[in-house]
């Protein structure tokens, strides 16, 4: 993990989790860099409104992944194709309908909420 992932105790209240990939970063980092996994379709960088609607301050548990491709917990949490970092186990909140439609229609990505309300179909 790089030191850029370090969050001081005072910054903990500024942590947010992406509603799609569940990566946990400060709101300032989302503002400066966007989401390292979802930026292509979320466009969070330099967009406070998009950050507010596509990330959540309400999340449970944190997993630190150094090598997601080799981690069984990353596979179980559907994180194995993402960058190393801190990830929430559950993220509360609803992704806006327009973002969800864009994901499914333009990018062919099935959105599965990370709050545990829907389960992935194995079919």
Curated annotation (Swiss-Prot):
Source species: Gibberella zeae (strain ATCC MYA-4620 / CBS 123657 / FGSC 9075 / NRRL 31084 / PH-1)
Single GO BP term: regulation of DNA-templated transcription
Family matches, as SUPFAM superfamilies: RNA polymerase subunits (SSF63393)
Subunit structure: Component of the SPT4-SPT5 complex. Interacts with RNA polymerase II.
Highest taxon in the source lineage: Eukaryota
GO molecular function: RNA polymerase II complex binding; zinc ion binding
SMART domains associated with the record: Spt4
UniProt protein name: Transcription elongation factor SPT4
Compartmental location: Nucleus; Chromosome, Centromere
GO cellular component, one term: DSIF complex
Main location: nucleus
InterPro entries: RPABC4/Spt4, Spt4, Spt4/RpoE2_Znf, Spt4_sf
